[in-house]
Amino acid sequence: MVGINAAYDNLPTSYLFSEIARRTRAFTAAHPELKVLRLGIGNTTEALPPTLIEALHHGVNLLSSRETYTGYGDEQGNSKLRKAIADSYLARNIKLDPLEVFVSDGAKSDLGNLTTIFGPGIVAVQDPVYPAYVDTTIISGRAGASFNGILEDLVYLVCNEKNGFFPSLPERADIIYLCYPNNPTGATATKEQLKTFVDFAIRNKSVIIFDAAYSAFIQDTNLPRSIYEIEGADKCAIEVNSFSKSAGFTGVRLGWTVVPKTLVVDRAEPGKVNSLWNRRQTTFFNGASNIPQEGGLVVLTEQGQRECQAIIDYYLENARIIRTGLLDLGITSFGGENAPYIWMKTPYGMKSWDFFDKLLEETHVVGTPGVGFGPSGEGHFRLSAFGHRENIEAAVDSIRKNLRL
């Protein structure tokens, strides 16, 4: 007799963005004459640059000839792309072996699957946090039961205005998820701040899973774009990154994960974790699609970087427009300078979902309730800078004119 995985019963009844979609559909059905302006999910909106389109076409064309056709590629990724990714770190004075780079179909699956190569242990996540980290921990059986929305075995690293959205060290944690620039708060971390977690992880033989998916949005040259800019991080950290937001590949699907050969965990010699991840990938993953990998190669060229930077600048200008609009209304907000997200306080301490409904009903703008990212997100709200400029401007204008404060 077989049953279900009981850990799934501890998941929230609905995924955050599914609930947003449900409420938005209900509003649209009740008011079909109104246009809803979406500043919610962080999905890219602008067309891919010409050089990238040409590269993707090239990838398709290669499949049209017997001489250039390719079937399955290496599970770890195209060797040229792995080298190009490793070389891209040199600008930050980081030397990677291409064999430490594993090409993926985007960051999300690796962020969840990485924990499968580690034994039981305590997981720590920032609070508020990207929901996938928490749901992954629940499914793996490491989170324990939920009591009033708090998971008994999960360590919550509180990030708020008081601590500058950078958490204090936990008493104990075996696997630590960190994300900078941060989703949802838009906060960044300094090298000195990250060093405290690297030192903690080395002392305790813990592993940091560092989500760097928004690193391309960092404009401040003093801020680190990679955890490996921190001395010792190669001994304790795995970095996950993606072409989704930096190159507009949300629908194309391509990313990478760095697993250093020098990474050390309890009862495992250097190289073991890299070997285990390689074994895991060759068992469960047939490799990223050949076509996106052709695009990824061009993203990392000088021309590709210039074209992608222009789109990043476009989204950051959207963020500036949103921040300015909130400031004009006297609403406190954070982020949006080195990240595409703006994290705002709800007026008068209003509950996040109550503000979602108020914003939708009064201004026809959709955002993301902060509490959906964790208990410490209550009383906050995330707005996304991913959108067409005309929609961003219309949304900010509607908030200015119609939000009753």
Spans of features found by a protein language model:
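N-terminal small-domain helix-loop-helix segment of the aminotransferase-like
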Residues: 2-105, 299-302, 405
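Helix C-cap/helix->beta junction micro-motif
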Residues: 31, 140, 203-204, 329, ...
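Conserved core of the PLP fold type I
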Residues: 66-203, 215-231, 398
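PLP-dependent enzyme catalytic core of the Aspartate aminotransferase-like
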Residues: 87, 91, 95, 349, ...
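Hydrophobic residues in well-ordered beta-strands that form the structural core
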Residues: 125, 210, 367-369
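Conserved core segment of the aminotransferase class I/II
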Residues: 147, 229-313, 320, 324, ...
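Conserved glycine-rich beta-strand-loop-beta hairpin in the small C-terminal domain of fold type I
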Residues: 293, 297, 312-323, 333-346, ...
